[in-house]
Amino acid sequence: MTSHPVFIDLSLDEQVQELRKYFKKLGAEISSEKSNKGVEDDLHKIIGVCEVCFKDGEPAQIDGILNSIVSIMITIPLDRGENIVLAYCEKMTKAPNQPLAKVCLQSLWRLFNNLDTASPLRYHVYYHLVQVAKQCDQVLEVFTGVDQLKSQFANCPPSSEQMQKLYRLLHDVTKDTNLELSSKVMIELLGTYTADNACVAREDAMKCIVTALADPNTFLLDPLLSLKPVRFLEGDLIHDLLSIFVSDKLPSYVQFYEDHKEFVNSQGLNHEQNMKKMRLLTFMQLAESYPEMTFDTLTKELQINEDEVEPFVIEVLKTKLVRARLDQANRKVHISSTMHRTFGAPQWEQLRDLLQAWKENLSSVREGLTNVSSAQLDLARSQKLIH
């Protein structure tokens, strides 16, 4: 979302006077005269009634009024501006409809970008900005990822508690429209806890697991097990379910669902979606061990009919998690490569051995090229001597 700098031609006193007159004309309980306590008191009074412009005003007109308020607000010194900014942010969350919510969003974004990047008030503005963005379906305009979020606060990082609160909000506003982004937010949230306070993050850990399991694009779930808050859930059903998605095959999930159907449903997880994901994860695990699989093996392991094998493999190939070739004539699937479901010590050792083999092969090629080059030079010298 882009925002233009705030610039108003009138003086502060003139702006305050005009705003007071405008809101009084709309029927607000406010004096048209300036306060003798100064511009900060004027702002408190104006912000206190500013929502009256939502009733009948046009969006463009309201945007101009809010822009005028913001232009005054950013002149207030930081040590005296917190209550004013918070009051204004709260008012912006009260827009009665989506078009006006977009106007309020633009106003908050304008305020956010005109505050000093080292101002701690930017956190509070951004928090309310996300709330308003949800009201008008504009969340991705103000939040595109964790890296972008951190860069916004690089000059004045919020406290761990503030970031936890913000991450929870971001998870809430993205979980219905972008599960992948929501899952990343929750993982980032759990990363803010330490060994000392991880035990109090039970609810956050459960939400993180459920979001990751529900996300159709998240398949590498092993990293969740290393998060401290998730470790505190060991022995709970949600942790058992996560462990199945991390390293077990489809039959383990089917048995778990039969034993704990009510629990799975209570978490908001869709059984059919879980089955689809577990089939894909099971296929990946089989592909790690078998470079070639028959259709009969797949129908048994994946609990599908034979006529479903080809469509299933095609869907797997679309994910790019596995590279394979269908052999319809011989009813087989030939595996070229697959992403590992878990990446622990064995996988690191395998990668080390592969890199070592490459190194040795490159050394052999280099040595061979050197020998060929030397032989050609010797031949060239001998031919010169002959002539």
Curated annotation (Swiss-Prot):
GO terms for cellular component: eukaryotic 43S preinitiation complex; eukaryotic 48S preinitiation complex; eukaryotic translation initiation factor 3 complex, eIF3m; Golgi apparatus. InterPro entries: ARM-type_fold, COPS7/eIF3m, eIF3m, eIF3m_C_helix, PCI_dom, WH_DNA-bd_sf. Transmembrane segments: none annotated. The keyword Lyase does not apply. Disulfide bonds: none annotated. It comes from the Eukaryota. It is found in: Cytoplasm; Golgi apparatus. SMART domains: PINT. PROSITE patterns: PCI (PS50250). Component of the eukaryotic translation initiation factor 3 (eIF-3) complex, which is involved in protein synthesis of a specialized repertoire of mRNAs and, together with other initiation factors, stimulates binding of mRNA and methionyl-tRNAi to the 40S ribosome. The eIF-3 complex specifically targets and initiates translation of a subset of mRNAs involved in cell proliferation. Belongs to the eIF-3 subunit M family. This is Eukaryotic translation initiation factor 3 subunit M. It comes from Drosophila mojavensis (Fruit fly).
